[in-house]
Amino acid sequence: MKLYSKYRIRIFFVILLIVLVFGIIFLRSIPSFGIKFNENNNLMNYLKISDEIYYRQTLNNCAPYAVMGIINILTGEIKDPEMLARETKWRIIKNLTFPQGLIDLLHKNNIKTKEYSLKIYSNNERIIWLKNQIDNRNPIILLVKVKNIQHYFTVIGYDKNGFMLYDSLQEKQNENTRKTIIDKKEYMGNRYYTNNEIINLWNDGGYKIFFKNWAVVCGKT
């Protein structure tokens, strides 16, 4: 009888865990309603980031590398991305990181966050929204799909035609394979995407119906 009771308790906790995990994922599939857009953007705006941290990521470690970029932008601190990778939770096979792992790592490093899902908005509204966050001095991490791979990168600035990023999947330098090349040396960040390029990558990101057009806006605590 006692064994039967223990079995039922275990089953209960397994079901509860499944419900909690599904709840966390499901809530993030709900669109962010009521977003206000300010179309009076600057021609150009950006947040400062150290060019010393334009590292090329190790296998599937885009989440901790994106967090490294956020920490540097908001605090000026240079963190070891591999140390951040070791601290990252919510990981599955081959180091793939669920958004909750990204959020937890940001919180652990005293970065406040707010999540959004912009799947119900137009592409133009998404572009305006990204610019609004930069104008508010808040960097953003987006979940995108690059060459059939789910990927996180950090948006740090914009001009009229596109966006400046720190992207740990940028091509490696020939002379130092731990560092990446830089698309536009006169800009902040190591990667530049046109408006259409970044929106297409963002639209393709997410897992089926979950985390579509998902973003996390970051700020100082």
Segments (PLM) and residue ranges:
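Active-site-adjacent structural segments surrounding the nucleophilic cysteine of cysteine proteases
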Residues: L3-N95, V146, D159, G219-K220
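Residues that form generic nucleotide/phosphate-binding pockets
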Residues: I73, E87, L105, Q133, ...
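Extracytoplasmic/secreted envelope proteins and their assembly/folding machinery
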Residues: A63-I71, P81, A85, P99-I103, ...
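Short aromatic/hydrophobic-glycine micro-motifs
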Residues: G76, I111-K112, P139
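A structural preference for short, hydrophobic beta-strand core positions in alpha/beta folds
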Residues: E115-Y116
